[in-house]
């Protein structure tokens, strides 16, 4: 029976082959060669189109396609470019006039110490930032001059040093190691749950810390799981540094919506996880609204899928540990949370170190080693570097160490008490203005607010005219202030000016001369995000 079935099947296959060959004999060999190749090519195109639609959404793809067709019409592209230039000119707000006397060649004869006088004159053109800027400068009060003086002395002592030369400048190498260790101790390195291997390096800022964490996670996941088409998932409140990292390292980035409380949506994050996912992200707190994401839940999610989980503590690293000690109800956020593999912390924000100092921390050395770049085949010798920069300013490392050692735990506790109390007072004051609403429930020192009754960007323009420098946000349209020690004595002034700004917009709605409300409003509503992207690039290009 088996032999009969086999012979019958063989006979049927021979007959089918003969019939197929007979039919195909009607076509030229070249056609038979091209058809499968063209089919494969079309399949790849269709697959790519579906991938783009899946990533960007059907609406965004259609808008982009239509705008591309419109730009092909004679005159349309020129019109768009002209309108774009008008917006760029308005955004510059007179900064072009400051470029008229720009020095472009070396002076024939050096200025000597006179250069300091020239620098003092230039400094007078800076905006008045004392107490008026959101974030930006984090030290304040009567003690600020003393702190600045101490930092400047520390930086001056080590202005010639470079941690790249480990054998020469052992002092700043030690300083860096101790800054990392002290920062890690604030974030759970001494707790059993951390695993006892927390390590890291200093970087130039929060962006480099995040970029390095992404790079290390990508390479670690390639080593552990063989992932070659990496993807990462971040909440839409996640910092734009992740977009940079995604562009630099060819990682597909998924931005998922936040929940109704403006925290990372764990369920939405889970839905986007697949076999190519290398990492997920949380913030403590997020830059836009000062709200801490559900770090514990995200940590469990990362653990269950065996992927990396980075926590952005650039703002909260030198506040949340002390706020918790002061009795504030702070949800878990550090290495005590299982699943957290890396953390970024800025020392130059609430750590009160000189600008250009941050840290990136890892749960263990196995992950961190993927941050390093080692070169063995260079004619210049064997080379290894821990961060993106080769040479690094040892002066900033020394300044950060001096800031942390001079303030100590007591100093940071006192500072945290002041700014947390100021933040709560400011938040309560904003809530009392009926035309405004506070976004979510801020966990730290950022208060974001919008309005259903007014154009919030017009309110921002009025505040700008009063000397305040606040941050404009989108989705929803809003503005925020990041409270620092600079703001502790001026909370009442801020609330008074804010009430007046609201009343002014109520009485006279509409943009003010030179205001940016129309631009912010239009950018938020513009469906073609590619055009907004071009606008931002044109503006940045005009600044340098």
UniProtKB/Swiss-Prot annotation:
The chain crosses the membrane at residues 30-50. This is Sphingosine-1-phosphate lyase. It comes from Arabidopsis thaliana. Cleaves phosphorylated sphingoid bases (PSBs), such as sphingosine-1-phosphate, into fatty aldehydes and phosphoethanolamine. May play a minor role in maintenance of sphingolipid metabolism during normal plant development and growth, but be required for maintaining sphingoid long chain bases (LCB) and their phosphorylated derivatives (LCB-P) levels when sphingolipid metabolism is perturbed. May play a role in dehydration stress. The gene is DPL1. Disruption phenotype: No visible phenotype under normal growth conditions. GO terms for cellular component: endoplasmic reticulum; endoplasmic reticulum membrane. Keywords: Endoplasmic reticulum, Lipid metabolism, Lyase, Membrane, Pyridoxal phosphate, Signal-anchor, Sphingolipid metabolism, Stress response, Transmembrane, Transmembrane helix. Residues 51-544 are cytoplasmic.
